[in-house]
């Protein structure tokens, strides 16, 4: 067993989830490559007196299920798994599918059924709100290919990024959290972007290894109806198996009134999932100094130093702006010079 896997498993169990004796832990792993880490997590859970409950997902089997799924089927599946999740104290999701596009040909109406009747009741309503949870990707050939890297070099990068001193990172975020907490209006400008919104009265929350690995962001949410202007995202975004590029959104009174991308019809179908899908649920700033370029993986891309993400869909309880949706889609814009630059003003201060 790679010693770095052992270090990561200990971090997940002892720092991220803080598993205590007698607590029940859902160990949810996706893809064959994740089995080694899943086994090590189970060992660490037992070491601290916890009780692991492993759950495996194969995305090819999931695709086959979703192609002809019904509302009634997903409602029952969601009810069963939500009941199980209610029993858990902690949750770790290790995701390592060997094909990020596996669900790309599932019809949008079927994905909407899955999001609304399964993902929302199981994950948003129970897992996020009632467990100490952490999610992460696991390095495999698919991820290395997306990062234009050999597998060995990508594994080295991955473990360097994931096995950071997150307690030290948390302390370093203090100033940014305080600054955001004291800000009313935010203005963001850049190539194709001129956007204004308020974050007044909504807490800024630091993220340092407790819910995501890798981590490194400070998030809040805009006042729901305060968003106006246009944003042009410069980072590809994989959602439901499809890679979106050149995404541009225009807002009026908080609502997305125009959306375009390399597949404008498909992206508008996502935003038509429900009313809340056309409003923003999160605004966050990425601060991980080890992540500097996109790799079509949200958990990494949203942490890029010099980036921000502006997220259509549901908000988090910790930074509640009242928006509710079956989707939560982190879309990333990088403002470093290599990606066109840009400026961010807090109450007119750069």
Positions of predicted regions on the chain:
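Active-site lining segments that contact anionic ligands and/or coordinate catalytic metals
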Residues: 228, 244-246, 253, 278-282, ...
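Oxyanion-binding "anion nests"
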Residues: 215-259
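Dual-mode signal for accessory low-complexity, basic/Gly-rich regions
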Residues: 258-323
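Short acidic-glycine loop/turn motifs at beta-strand connectors
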Residues: 191-192, 199-201, 251-253, 346-349
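Intrinsically disordered terminal and processing segments
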Residues: 309, 313-350
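Active-site bordering "gate/hinge" segments
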Residues: 1-229
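Short, glycine-/Ser/Thr-/acidic-enriched flexible segments
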Residues: 32-33, 97-99, 140, 202, ...
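Short polybasic amphipathic segments
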Residues: 185-188, 247, 340-347
């Amino acid at each position: 067993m790679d010693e770095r896997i052992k270090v990561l498993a200990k971090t997940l169990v002892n720092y991220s989830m803080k598993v205590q004796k007698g607590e029940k832990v859902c160990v949810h792993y996706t893809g064959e490559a994740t089995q080694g880490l899943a086994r090590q997590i189970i060992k660490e859970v037992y070491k601290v007196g916890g009780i692991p409950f492993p759950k495996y997902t194969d995305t090819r089997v999931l695709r086959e299920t979703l192609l002809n799924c019904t509302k009634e089927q997903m409602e029952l599946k969601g009810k069963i798994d939500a009941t199980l999740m209610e029993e858990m104290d902690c949750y770790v999701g290790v995701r390592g599918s060997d094909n990020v596009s596996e669900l790309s040909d599932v019809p949008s109406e079927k994905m909407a059924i899955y999001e609304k009747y399964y993902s929302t009741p199981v994950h948003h309503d129970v897992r996020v709100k009632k467990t100490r949870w952490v999610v992460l990707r696991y390095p495999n050939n698919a991820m290395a290919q997306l990062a234009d890297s050999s597998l060995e070099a990508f594994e080295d990068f991955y473990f360097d990024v994931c096995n950071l001193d997150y307690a030290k990172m948390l302390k370093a975020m203090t100033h940014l959290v305080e600054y955001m907490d004291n800000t009313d209006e935010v203005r963001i400008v850049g190539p194709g972007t001129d956007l204004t919104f308020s974050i007044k009265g909504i807490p800024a929350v630091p993220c340092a290894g407790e819910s995501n690995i890798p981590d490194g962001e400070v998030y809040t949410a805009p006042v729901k109806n305060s968003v106006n202007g246009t944003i042009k995202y410069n980072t590809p975004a994989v959602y439901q198996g499809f890679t979106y590029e050149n995404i541009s959104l225009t807002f009026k009174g908080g609502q997305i009134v125009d959306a375009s991308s390399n597949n404008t019809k498909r992206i508008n179908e996502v935003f038509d999932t429900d009313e809340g899908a056309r409003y923003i649920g999160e605004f966050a700033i990425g601060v991980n100094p080890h992540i500097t370029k996109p790799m079509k993986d949200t958990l990494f891309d949203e942490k890029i130093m010099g980036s921000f993400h502006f997220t259509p869909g549901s908000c988090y309880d910790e930074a509640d702006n009242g928006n509710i949706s079956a989707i939560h889609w982190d879309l990333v814009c990088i403002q470093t010079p290599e990606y066109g630059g840009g400026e961010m003003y807090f109450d007119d201060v750069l």
